[in-house]
From Swiss-Prot:
NCBIfam families: V_ATPase_subD (TIGR00309). It comes from the Eukaryota. Subunit of the V1 complex of vacuolar(H+)-ATPase (V-ATPase), a multisubunit enzyme composed of a peripheral complex (V1) that hydrolyzes ATP and a membrane integral complex (V0) that translocates protons. V-ATPase is responsible for acidifying and maintaining the pH of intracellular compartments and in some cell types, is targeted to the plasma membrane, where it is responsible for acidifying the extracellular environment. Transmembrane segments: none annotated. Residues 214-259 are annotated as: Disordered. Keywords: Hydrogen ion transport, Ion transport, Transport. One of its GO terms (molecular function) is proton-transporting ATPase activity, rotational mechanism. InterPro entries: V_ATPase_D (IPR002699). The lineage of its organism: Eukaryota, Metazoa, Ecdysozoa, Nematoda, Chromadorea. This is V-type proton ATPase subunit D. Belongs to the V-ATPase D subunit family. One of its GO terms (cellular component) is proton-transporting V-type ATPase complex. V-ATPase is a heteromultimeric enzyme made up of two complexes: the ATP-hydrolytic V1 complex and the proton translocation V0 complex. The V1 complex consists of three catalytic AB heterodimers that form a heterohexamer, three peripheral stalks each consisting of EG heterodimers, one central rotor including subunits D and F, and the regulatory subunits C and H.
């Protein structure tokens, strides 16, 4: 039988059952490769979309922070230094961040959401003077906080998607360049071995038939050399005689008891 050991294949015994099993595994590997390829395409599409949003938000973040800085300068100019008032009134953070998970083709992406916990504790700040500027200041910084949380979500999703895409691409390449070729090499080996087994079986049957035919010819030649079989001596005479009755008693053989 042919070896095929030089190829990278699965160690199996060549049989019809193994061939059917390898065909099933090949079909499953091809289907898995197709699904992973679609998953990688979907992740790449979402990855490019997130990258575009990150660039846009960073540009917008610069403008929002610049506007918030100008609002802070205006509020300090009109209302004076109110930082000590804010610090004294702080008991807990008003803005909090909660996280939820978003499923994208089997990959869980973290999504951060900013929300205000409780009423505004600084409603009376700037009541004497500069109230409008302080209100505008709070609005601008609230917008900056929301934008920062959104940017944090995008950057976290960017990193998570980058790792998921790398893992998916490694799996796709492993199936395409390792698993499927191994199964195909195994199928080729099994088919080659089965064909060789069939050829050997056919040759063996032909050899047996040839030996039987040769033996019959030798027996026929031997019978021809010996001629017809001879009949046994007296065989014809005994055949012409009627069968002897063993119960009948011949008179000559009777014993003489009395004279």
């Amino acid at each position: 039988m042919s070896g095929g050991g030089g190829k990278d294949r699965i160690a199996v015994f060549p049989s019809r059952m193994a061939q059917t099993l390898m065909k099933t595994r090949l079909k499953g590997a091809q289907k898995g490769h197709s699904l992973l390829k679609k998953k990688a395409d979907a992740l790449n599409l979402r990855f490019r979309d997130i990258l575009k949003k990150i660039v846009e938000n960073k540009v917008l973040m610069g403008e929002v922070m610049k506007e918030a800085a100008f609002s802070l300068a205006e509020a300090k100019f009109t209302a004076g230094d109110f930082s000590h008032t804010v610090i004294q009134n702080v008991s807990q953070a008003q803005y909090r961040v909660r996280m939820k998970k978003e499923n994208v083709v089997g990959v869980l992406l973290p999504v951060f959401d900013a929300y205000q916990d409780g009423p505004d504790a600084y409603d009376l700040t700037g009541l004497g003077k500069g109230g409008a500027n302080i209100a505008r200041l709070k609005k601008n910084y609230n917008k900056a906080i929301e934008l920062l949380v959104e940017l944090a979500t995008l950057q976290t999703c960017f990193i998570t998607l980058d790792e998921a895409i790398k893992v998916t691409n490694r799996r796709v390449n492993a199936i395409e360049h390792v698993i499927i070729p191994r199964i195909e090499n195994t199928l080729t080996y099994i088919v080659t071995e089965l064909d060789e087994m069939e050829r050997e079986e056919f040759f063996r049957m032909k050899k047996i038939q040839a030996n039987k035919k040769k033996l019959k010819e030798q027996e026929a030649a031997q019978r021809a050399l010996e001629g017809p079989p001879k009949e046994e001596a007296g065989g014809t005479h005994s055949e012409n005689q009627p069968p002897r009755n063993l119960l009948a008693v011949e008179e000559d053989n009777l014993p003489v008891l009395f004279n």
